[in-house]
Amino acid sequence: MGFPKVERLLINYKTLDEFKKFKGCGAQELSMLEELQANIIENDSESPFYGIYYGGSLIARMSLYMKRNGGEPFEITGPYLELYKLEVLPTFQKQGFGQMLVNHAKQMQFPIKTIARIHSSGFWDKLSFNPVSVTDGDFYIWHPETNLNAVTNEESA
């Protein structure tokens, strides 16, 4: 078994079964099951879902959406990524898998916007994201132009 790596998840019934493992692990707002079911096309490779398999099982996942323009108050001009629903199964937490997913997104070299959920602000701070508070809630933003050295070859997946 090789070292786990981040890969784009196919939208298919196998992935749907893998997502069911996450259903009881986190908050309802992290659930991707319904989102996947609504978009199921067998082996669609253009999915917004990314994950890490370990021993043949999905152990961590996130969704990434390309957006056109962030504008105020996010100080994002041009296209950016929205990172949603980052989740690692409890047995595999605190082992760097969440960081691997975020570093995969950072390698795309677009600004990244995310919402800190469930006491995760320390995680985002550690990964050089900056907090932004707006009426809609608290967000975290990462800018590649100010963080060009934030992802090293050793950290990248």
Curated annotation (Swiss-Prot):
Q: Which InterPro entries match?
A: Acyl_CoA_acyltransferase, GNAT_dom, YlbP
> Mind listing the UniProt keywords for this protein, alphabetically?
Acyltransferase, Transferase
Q: What is its EC number?
A: 2.3.1.-
Specify the enzyme's EC class, one word: transferase
NCBIfam families from the UniProt entry: PRK13688.1
- Recorded protein name is Uncharacterized N-acetyltransferase BCG9842_B1219
> Where is each N-acetyltransferase domain found?
9-154
User: What domain of life does the native source organism fall in?
Assistant: Bacteria
Species for this entry: Bacillus cereus (strain G9842)
Extract the GO molecular function terms from the UniProt entry: acyltransferase activity, transferring groups other than amino-acyl groups
Name the SUPFAM superfamilies for this protein: Acyl-CoA N-acyltransferases (Nat) (SSF55729)
